[in-house]
UniProtKB/Swiss-Prot annotation:
It comes from the Bacteria. Belongs to the AHA1 family. Gene3D superfamilies: 3.30.530.20. This is Uncharacterized protein YndB. It comes from Bacillus subtilis (strain 168).
């Protein structure tokens, strides 16, 4: 997603190849039960425009499904900071290419309300967090 502000922080992008067919990965990233296995408890429903909540460490985060292109792409607004999370899947036969994009970052010194920290600090923590979530938790959820 293009940044509106040239001083904004760059998107977080994580890409991996999963040892599972695309349909299994899609079910894991596009259902409430699947998302809860590797990300956060939620009341997600796969429907464009659907509002839902992720139960984050900072409390419930309001979200809204923006786009669904089964089984290759899902994007949603996350919380009230302007963030958008996108899951992109690529069919590689018995494997699946998976890319997560966390966009909508503000300027480095702008404070993120719930965390009460600068955007640059929150982005740094989330970048590391996404690495573990995608490389370990998502991989385990789809490859077991």
């Amino acid at each position: 997603m293009a940044q509106n502000n040239e001083n904004a922080l760059p998107d977080i992008t994580k890409s991996i190849t999963l040892e599972a067919p695309i349909q299994k990965v899609w079910e894991t990233v596009s259902t409430s039960e699947g998302i809860a296995k590797w990300f956060m408890p939620n009341d997600f429903q796969l429907k464009e425009g659907q509002e839902f909540h992720l139960q984050s460490p900072f409390g419930p985060s309001p979200c809204k499904v923006l786009a669904v292109q089964a089984p290759t792409e899902l994007s949603f607004e996350w919380d009230t900071e302007g963030w958008v999370v996108t899951f992109q899947l690529e069919d590689l036969g018995e494997k699946t290419g998976f890319t997560l994009i966390h966009s909508g970052w503000k300027e480095p010194n702008e404070v993120i309300g719930k965390a009460n920290e600068k955007s640059s600090v929150v982005r740094g923590k989330m970048d590391g967090g996404w690495t573990g979530i995608v490389n370990e938790r998502l991989r385990k959820a789809v490859e077991e």
